Amino acid sequence: MMPFPVTTQGPPQPAPPPNRYGVSSPISLAVPKETDCLLTQRLIETLRPFGVFEEEEELQRRILVLEKLNNLVKEWIREISESKSLPQSVIENVGGKIFTFGSYRLGVHTKGADIDALCVAPSHVDRSDFFTSFYAKLKLQEEVKDLRAVEEAFVPVIKLCFDGIEIDILFARLALQTIPEDLDLRDDSLLKNLDIRCIRSLNGCRVTDEILHLVPNIDNFRLTLRAIKLWAKCHNIYSNILGFLGGVSWAMLVARTCQLYPNAVASTLVRKFFLVFSEWEWPNPVLLKEPEERNLNLPVWDPRVNPSDRYHLMPIITPAYPQQNSTYNVSISTRMVMIEEFKQGLAITHEILLSKAEWSKLFEAPSFFQKYKHYIVLLASASTEKQHLEWVGLVESKIRILVGSLEKNEFITLAHVNPQSFPAPKENPDMEEFRTMWVIGLGLKKPDNSEILSIDLTYDIQSFTDTVYRQAVNSKMFEMGMKITAMHLRRKELHQLLPHHVLQDKKAHSTEGRRLTDLNDSSFDLSAGCENSMSVPSSTSTMKTGPLISSSQGRNSPALAVMTASVANIQATEFSLQQVNTNESSGVALNESIPHAVSQPAISPSPKAMVARVVSSTCLISHPDLQETQQQTYLIL
């Protein structure tokens, strides 16, 4: 197996028609028509300005860097073998190899993207060797910059910049004396007698390779995935850590679409993607292949056996053993947001099919800051850049807990977090302080039998800050100066914290510079409008708070996810308002319908009532490390 992807785009070739792809029969085996190929070419031209295609020169540079890294690994393993007095016959054939996974291995990486890599070594090479002698060897290379090891991570990794290309290297030691060049990591027998960290490290490569193995046409899959990933980023639903979907989950959804329409080209597959998943009957899982039991006693996703798996709202199951749900972070709110986006994507691609819109419309950014009347702004700050980097990572990883807590409030219909983070204006221009903000849009409802409604968010916010500070202290990461602040702002007050170009209704949207980390206008007045904002400083270990329920557990009783993939009602539903002529578009089976876009959004709109005021009472908190105040906050409708 080659570690480097082939990214050349050749003419699409129809796949040979087997009885079924994946876990069900295809919906349609129709081959593309001239209009479909023309729409695909227009899609490619629309994608180019977004930087989703890498130039050949840059691709060759990546290949050269990986070859150098691969040679370093082989050289290092030979040195380790000699130091451990292995026979010369073994040393000469000991091998060792760098494998790639993620977007680069899938062949859908963008300009300037990093590379996920895996160093595979034989049994006599220890993980400690990887983080000592191999780390030292990398440090001697002139091309290597920003070298750092994260040995205690859930998946231990060495991070570096090699000749200007960011690379994350994982490590796995196999129960083999030598590592052959033609090693296939999809072989389940390789998992025998491995520790859990090696299994986790292997998982990325195994899943990526399995996905490529299970799609009917790799070129069509890649182009479709490029389009869907760009769409997801433009629409702010690309973030596994915040409860949306990450790269591997989007890849599996696209792969399932390719299985259902094995001969379709990218323009058709993009449209079918929205059709399939706007109608998917969640929590039925998305599966690319039937789960297999290997009797290796590894935990696998199975709601029949594991009660916690029954609470997963949008399960997308990895195809490699041990099968896992890649979307366990999805909450009620994030699923609602994504389903609405699927439906809107279906409506737009339907317009494109009828020549009523261009592909560029699909990649227009939604108006997040115009969508809701009420917002919660989370602000994380630290005294130094290094502290800020660690602090922001921890806070961001816990935001989904706050979303899950807010969802349980009977008067909150939706807690929509924007995955983009924004630099916050400085509170004191004379002090060096590093600040980052996240914004959560709130959908609220007002009972009919009440004219005034008080929504107390104190417990939700305080529980969230408790969780963050507790983990920071327990992991010995906490430093004085690390703070979390939460503020409630109405839509018309967002300009106090966010620059105009972020708030304006932008149509054209580029993925370059999306995190906006270069913005920090110190002229913004953080204290403006403080009457209508709430500040919730750090919590302490002395505060007695109940445990938060995971964001994957909703307000309602969980529905048991069955171990079968459904094609929803795609084949059963009939045309309702508008009907597509099957002679005008290939890949549309005669018994298949494209549902008309709903006229009302899937997410409940914000209520008419505005927040009138915020009532606060303050009490002191005593803590050996911190002296802070706690505010109780109510939204008065």
Swiss-Prot record:
<dbReference type="GO" id="GO:1990817">
    <property type="term" value="F:poly(A) RNA polymerase activity"/>
</dbReference>
<dbReference type="InterPro" id="IPR048840">
    <property type="entry name" value="PolA_pol_NTPase"/>
</dbReference>
<feature type="compositionally biased region" description="Low complexity">
    <location>
        <begin position="1"/>
        <end position="10"/>
    </location>
</feature>
<keyword id="KW-0460">Magnesium</keyword>
<dbReference type="Pfam" id="PF04928">
    <property type="entry name" value="PAP_central"/>
</dbReference>
<dbReference type="GO" id="GO:0003723">
    <property type="term" value="F:RNA binding"/>
</dbReference>
<dbReference type="InterPro" id="IPR007012">
    <property type="entry name" value="PolA_pol_cen_dom"/>
</dbReference>
<feature type="binding site">
    <location>
        <position position="238"/>
    </location>
    <ligand>
        <name>ATP</name>
    </ligand>
</feature>
<feature type="binding site">
    <location>
        <position position="114"/>
    </location>
    <ligand>
        <name>Mg(2+) 2</name>
    </ligand>
</feature>
<dbReference type="InterPro" id="IPR011068">
    <property type="entry name" value="NuclTrfase_I-like_C"/>
</dbReference>
<dbReference type="Pfam" id="PF04926">
    <property type="entry name" value="PAP_RNA-bind"/>
</dbReference>
<feature type="binding site">
    <location>
        <position position="229"/>
    </location>
    <ligand>
        <name>ATP</name>
    </ligand>
</feature>
<dbReference type="GO" id="GO:0006397">
    <property type="term" value="P:mRNA processing"/>
</dbReference>
<dbReference type="Pfam" id="PF20750">
    <property type="entry name" value="PAP_NTPase"/>
</dbReference>
<dbReference type="GO" id="GO:0005783">
    <property type="term" value="C:endoplasmic reticulum"/>
</dbReference>
<keyword id="KW-0547">Nucleotide-binding</keyword>
<keyword id="KW-0464">Manganese</keyword>
<keyword id="KW-0808">Transferase</keyword>
<feature type="site" description="Interaction with RNA">
    <location>
        <position position="154"/>
    </location>
</feature>
<feature type="binding site">
    <location>
        <position position="168"/>
    </location>
    <ligand>
        <name>Mg(2+) 2</name>
    </ligand>
</feature>
<dbReference type="InterPro" id="IPR014492">
    <property type="entry name" value="PolyA_polymerase"/>
</dbReference>
<keyword id="KW-0507">mRNA processing</keyword>
<feature type="region of interest" description="Disordered">
    <location>
        <begin position="535"/>
        <end position="555"/>
    </location>
</feature>
<feature type="binding site">
    <location>
        <position position="168"/>
    </location>
    <ligand>
        <name>ATP</name>
    </ligand>
</feature>
<feature type="binding site">
    <location>
        <position position="110"/>
    </location>
    <ligand>
        <name>ATP</name>
    </ligand>
</feature>
<feature type="region of interest" description="Disordered">
    <location>
        <begin position="1"/>
        <end position="23"/>
    </location>
</feature>
<feature type="site" description="Interaction with RNA">
    <location>
        <position position="525"/>
    </location>
</feature>
<keyword id="KW-0694">RNA-binding</keyword>
<feature type="binding site">
    <location>
        <begin position="101"/>
        <end position="103"/>
    </location>
    <ligand>
        <name>ATP</name>
    </ligand>
</feature>
<feature type="binding site">
    <location>
        <position position="116"/>
    </location>
    <ligand>
        <name>Mg(2+) 1</name>
    </ligand>
</feature>
<feature type="binding site">
    <location>
        <begin position="247"/>
        <end position="248"/>
    </location>
    <ligand>
        <name>ATP</name>
    </ligand>
</feature>
<dbReference type="InterPro" id="IPR007010">
    <property type="entry name" value="PolA_pol_RNA-bd_dom"/>
</dbReference>
<keyword id="KW-0479">Metal-binding</keyword>
<feature type="site" description="Interaction with RNA">
    <location>
        <position position="329"/>
    </location>
</feature>
<dbReference type="GO" id="GO:0046872">
    <property type="term" value="F:metal ion binding"/>
</dbReference>
<dbReference type="GO" id="GO:0031123">
    <property type="term" value="P:RNA 3'-end processing"/>
</dbReference>
<feature type="binding site">
    <location>
        <begin position="114"/>
        <end position="116"/>
    </location>
    <ligand>
        <name>ATP</name>
    </ligand>
</feature>
<protein>
    <recommendedName>
        <fullName>Poly(A) polymerase beta</fullName>
        <ecNumber>2.7.7.19</ecNumber>
    </recommendedName>
</protein>
<dbReference type="GO" id="GO:0005634">
    <property type="term" value="C:nucleus"/>
</dbReference>
<comment type="subunit">
    <text>Interacts with GSG1.</text>
</comment>
<feature type="site" description="Interaction with RNA">
    <location>
        <position position="400"/>
    </location>
</feature>
<keyword id="KW-0067">ATP-binding</keyword>
